[in-house]
Amino acid sequence: MSNAPREAPAPWPAHAGQRLAAFRAFLAAQGGPALPAQEAEALDAFSLAEPNAFWRALWAFADLPGDPGARDRSSDGTMAGTRFFPDGRVNFTEALLRGPAEALAILARDETGAETRLTRGALRDAVAALAAQLAEGGFGPGDRLCALTPNRPEAVIAALATAALGGTFASCSPDFAPRAVLDRFAPLRPKALLVSDGSRYKGRALPLGETAAQLKAALKPALALSYAVLGTELEGFTPLRRPTPGAGASWRADDRGALDPLYVLFSSGTTGAPKGIIHGTAGPLLQHLKEHQLHCDLGPGDRLLYYTTCGWMMWNWLVSALASGATIGLYDGAPDAPGTGEEDAFLSFAREGAFTHLGTSPAYLTRLAQLGDGDPLPALRVLLSTGAPLPGWAWAFAKKRFGDVPLCSISGGTDLLGCFALGHPERPMEAGALQGRGLAMAMDFDHGDDDGTAGELVCRAPFPSQPLGLIDDPTGERLRATYFPGDPNTWRHGDYGYWTEKGGVVLLGRADAVLNRGGVRMGTAEFYGPLEALPSLADCLIVDRPAG
């Protein structure tokens, strides 16, 4: 695979970018600039030159329930200390729940093929029921709910109910070791704990009863809630309340401050104890609306399925797609579990669920390539990939395997709960490259330029989804040391890459994982291609061993 020719990848179809075109028209109608159609550079330049106007226009374009407030931003004079819409109010839960009651909100399936469907009306009923259950237990603004849960509708319901009451939501997936879960949840001192009785993976039932008991004993939450995946009851936990059909029709969630903490996500913990990263309410939602609608051409009637767990920021990214009127797909289990015919369970779900947008990873696409040919997915419009640099051969393979469907590699992180670089319906598609930077994201490469010289990915201007802070960092000192070392006006992301001549982005891996042998820098991407060509190799470790 590493030596496969880099033939031209499938481009975006001519009719793509409808949401992008609608946003341009909206800008002009609201007194903004009349930007030329199909010219990505003009909109990119406007978003960078006038970020306040761009983000305020996006709020209005998305018709977010709430008010952005009088001020576009507050600042202490640095990027690190800048916050967008400090006076704003937004109803996050309503933004995700609104729409026709009969429209499909969630299509969920596990690796056994068991499926759950929730309309927007049924989802509202479930969120209203859990919000009432939490409120009766004393849960309110400023409280935190921690969830240990597989990727199932109950996780989405819990996040929306928490947001509805002004709380903060954090989650881990069942594949975390008990100690790892406790290391993440304990600093949050949660008021409520939600745990499933277990999960299934590769045909095995994985009970969580013992872990749940350990968490409850250590965290001492005021509310301990559970739901069943394996059909068992957890001792000392109260089951989630069953919703009453139609009861949510007259229920409305509370508005929240745009800068109120909504999510806590966790760093990997590879360089010490995991950091709890606090994200606000409006900023990540605006970032996701931009990425979904303007970059991925996602809107009402579309269906987005991304392979993720509740321990990864892509889960939060996926959930936000409800705000664009899309149906979200939740898959729980091993992606390579047996599916229909010769397909795996994940791909079978993508086909049978008629998903228009499918999110994968380099590892998953590599496995598909090793399996050989297969049938296209008739409903598929956009193929996405993230989690690692995508090898150059993947674009040719995707075109062969899925037909004329654009393959968009996206890259960002937990730290910003969004993307620095991703797809774009109006930019050229290049094998081996992300199409470009996200709108209003002033990303660049430090010591990099257009001739292929690589550098560290940096961002030199504020954006709404910057973290509000870190857990147990009241002065912000750790946050500045982590993301703004040496300069409070430059975000250092740690990725390593360069620009292409067409404005695309090539990422080679993490800057701290780059090897330098005799002045030649080699990132992780340089090793993926040759190693992935060896089907007998299950895993590997690259070590820089000096000669001698």
Give the ranges of each region predicted by the language model:
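AMP-binding/adenylate-forming catalytic core of the ANL superfamily
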Residues: A147, C172-D197, R351, L358, ...
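Structural core segment of the AMP-binding/adenylate-forming
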Residues: A164-R242, S361-P362
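Conserved AMP-binding/adenylation subdomain of ANL enzymes
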Residues: L285-R303, M313-T356, L371
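Conserved AMP-binding/adenylate-forming
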Residues: R351, R381-G504, A511-V514, F527
